[in-house]
Amino acid sequence: MGARASVLSGGELDRWEKIRLRPGGKKQYRLKHIVWASRKLERFAVNPGLLETSKGCRQILGQLQPSLQTGSEELRSLYNTVATLYCVHQRIEVRDTKEALDKIEEEQNKSKKKAQQAAADTGNSSQVSQNYPIVQNLQGQMVHQAISPRTLNAWVKVIEEKAFSPEVIPMFAALSEGATPQDLNTMLNTVGGHQAAMQMLKETINEEAAEWDRLHPVHAGPIAPGQMREPRGSDIAGTTSTLQEQIGWMTNNPPTPVGEIYKRWIILGLNKIVRMYSPISILDIRQGPKEPFRDYVDRFYKTLRAEQASQEVKNWMTETLLVQNANPDCKTILKALGPAATLEEMMTACQGVGGPGHKARVLAEAMSQVTNSATIMMQRGNFRRQGKTVKCFNCGKEGHIARNCKAPRKKGCWKCGREGHQMKDCTERQANFLREDLAFPQGKAREFSSEQTRANSPTRGELQVWGRDNNSLSEAGAERQGTVSFSFPQITLWQRPIVTIKIGGQLKEALLDTGADDTVLEEINLPGRWKPKMIGGIGGFIKVRQYDEV
């Protein structure tokens, strides 16, 4: 790292660290950005030592600039870093990366005007290529330098490692900058495997060459002295043209950039191959429930590079699908950030989502909300007790169960009243609420008949319930409603008799249910208002009419 970071002196380093990454942003350039740029240049087979001088930075910018339109975000970041470093070497005061790019563009326009003026003064064309691999020798002739083995080796390694993944296209564009059709064919011939893909590439080149011949027909008549023939599609592909003809077309006035045309055809074919090797659509890229957001973004942009769409469409895909296809946890965070959030802000906000720390934090927040809501309910008096009051089967009192009852144990079954077995072993389906040994002045208790037992069924007609808990009848009311002929005693749970009562001027048999504080009557019509009610016990539920203040 020390060798890479030594490209700047002390004063230059101070100016470098004052420049912001984006206008109005807080982050500034650091040494790590220079180290990162050096490593990326090594990947592109470019000497990272060129970063030490402004001239070297200018050469790197000239090599990277033609690939910006089809390059990846990584390539653009590298170009921005080198442009900012060039301004630092030239002592050009800039505050952020955008100003550095504006300064570079301004200098390029000035140099282009100077070159045009010089070409007009000397009578030479301003479009003459001075870039590698076509260079001008000492005699002023344009000569070709063969593509270096280092460049070919870098290209072969990319094909072997990436196997026509989306990043192969910008890599090819960077390595083939300024190359002639012969150089491009040399690069294609070095690919040993993937012959099916290479055959697809040849078919695409033949189609584009035929389209070129259709759009550029040969002019009739002889060629003027000193003029070159017009290139055909096969000439551009390098199959029917010599190296000297290719150099002549590229350096002619006006020039015919056969190398750039052929490279555009090759990139078109590579796009088809990448689409075949990467059949996944951008619509299918979704974040897994436990997948880190960073890995999801890597997969998203890798697939986006293989999409054949304009930059406007890709920008729309990024703004819409990146948030829409995230998992629920990340989607909640991204929607809270808003549509103007940058990718850096998204990755920072979603860092750690899905891990144990995030889950513990979400669980703690949920428990806190539940606790607060329960506290508010209890403070407002909305808290209702969920458990029912227990009742003892032995003595009939509430507040304890038979196991803890201090009263003498009742003999027999607590369900049917017979001796010889306990309640847990009782086979009686319907509870027998009546005891045969009870004697009352109004009549003897008896068991339900089969007809009365069916009255407990939900399908049976409605019964009448006389509520006794909220009636304190006056004598006048008693005369109007009818007087009960019996004063009900306090009867325990085991003593539920059927007695004869007089209500509404009618004599009826009624079941006294002291536990529920209700009197149940059957087949009687009473005047006044009533409301529907469901009552039930061990035998089931029945529908009744409830009359109050009877």
Swiss-Prot record:
Q: Where in this protein does the record put region Dimerization/Multimerization of capsid protein p24?
A: 277-363
Other remarks on this protein: HIV-1 lineages are divided in three main groups, M (for Major), O (for Outlier), and N (for New, or Non-M, Non-O). The vast majority of strains found worldwide belong to the group M. Group O seems to be endemic to and largely confined to Cameroon and neighboring countries in West Central Africa, where these viruses represent a small minority of HIV-1 strains. The group N is represented by a limited number of isolates from Cameroonian persons. The group M is further subdivided in 9 clades or subtypes (A to D, F to H, J and K). Resistance to inhibitors associated with mutations are observed both in viral protease and in reverse transcriptase. Most of the time, single mutations confer only a modest reduction in drug susceptibility. Combination of several mutations is usually required to develop a high-level drug resistance. These mutations are predominantly found in clade B viruses and not in other genotypes. They are listed in the clade B representative isolate HXB2 (AC P04585).
Zinc finger boundaries on the chain: CCHC-type: 390-407, 411-428
The ranges of region (Disordered) come to 106-128, 444-464
Query: Where is the stretch described as Interaction with membrane phosphatidylinositol 4,5-bisphosphate?
Result: 73-77
Free-text description of this protein's post-translational modifications in UniProt? Specific enzymatic cleavages by the viral protease yield mature proteins. The protease is released by autocatalytic cleavage. The polyprotein is cleaved during and after budding, this process is termed maturation. Proteolytic cleavage of p66 RT removes the RNase H domain to yield the p51 RT subunit. Nucleocapsid protein p7 might be further cleaved after virus entry.
- According to the lineage, what is the superkingdom? Viruses
> Which positions are catalytic residues?
D513 (for protease activity)
Record lipid sites (N-myristoyl glycine): G2
Q: Where is this region: Interaction with Gp41?
A: 7-31
Reactions that this protein is recorded to catalyse: Specific for a P1 residue that is hydrophobic, and P1' variable, but often Pro
Peptidase A2 domain: residues covered: 508-550
SUPFAM superfamilies this protein is in? Acid proteases, Retroviral matrix proteins, Retrovirus capsid dimerization domain-like, Retrovirus capsid protein, N-terminal core domain, Retrovirus zinc finger-like domains
Annotated region described as Interaction with host CALM1, given as residue ranges: 8-43
- According to the UniProt entry, which residue ranges have a biased composition of type Polar residues? 450-459
Q: List the disulfide bonds.
A: none
Keyword match Protein biosynthesis: no
Species this protein is from: Human immunodeficiency virus type 1 group M subtype B (isolate CDC-451) (HIV-1)
Q: Where is this motif: Nuclear export signal?
A: 16-22
- Identify this protein by name: Gag-Pol polyprotein
Q: Where is this region: Interaction with human PPIA/CYPA and NUP153?
A: 189-227
Record's InterPro entries? Answer: Aspartic_peptidase_AS, Gag_p24_C, Lentvrl_matrix_N, Matrix_HIV/RSV_N, Peptidase_A2_cat, Peptidase_aspartic_dom_sf, Primate_lentivir_Gag_pol-like, Retropepsins
Q: Does the keyword Nucleus apply?
A: no
